[in-house]
Amino acid sequence: MTIKLIVGLANPGAEYAATRHNAGAWFVDLLAERLRAPLREEAKFFGYTSRVTLGGEDVRLLVPTTFMNLSGKAVAAMASFFRINPDEILVAHDELDLPPGVAKFKLAGAHGGHNGLKDIISKLGNNPNFHRLRIGIGHPGDKNKVVGFVLGKPPVSEQKLIDEAIDEAARCTEMWFTDGLTKATNRLHAFKAQ
């Protein structure tokens, strides 16, 4: 099994660029930068895309330009065009249930209330069997404050932790292609930014 599509979830536009909900896009942006493969807008895929080589494999990067709750439209368009199966997709997203400074790989599972994941599962024919990169952003402590929290900007101290976790996640994603998922997962799951 090889990953052929890496997606970073986000809301479009400058007003959302620095919000916690865009952590997935921060990850794909960093990966594109590390691999010297600038993202370019591609209307037919409803997002910014790039093509990279990881461990000798041809991989597409995607940051949808749809709103978060419509992310599945972009993912399904690209998966359909390139004949990519759900289990060949890695979706990076913000994760309330992990603290800033932590990121974890996961295969399949429910959407956990995340509107981006919810729409992707739906648009892939109710198939949740894709890989996720869960980027910890922490939780406001009150479920009624979640919307404002994910659409807010993290304080500098938290941003630093999130950035360090994303940096490690990018390294571990590259490692996945050269050394396998188990080794990459073990390394990433042992990491906690200080």
Swiss-Prot record:
Active site per the UniProt annotation: 21 (proton acceptor)
Main location: cytoplasm
Any one Gene Ontology BP term: protein quality control for misfolded or incompletely synthesized proteins
EC number: 3.1.1.29
KW Lipoprotein (keyword) present: no
Subcellular location: Cytoplasm
Residue sites binding tRNA per the record: 16, 67, 69, 115
Classification via HAMAP family: Pept_tRNA_hydro_bact
UniProt family annotation: Belongs to the PTH family.
Protein name: Peptidyl-tRNA hydrolase
Organism: Shigella boydii serotype 4 (strain Sb227)
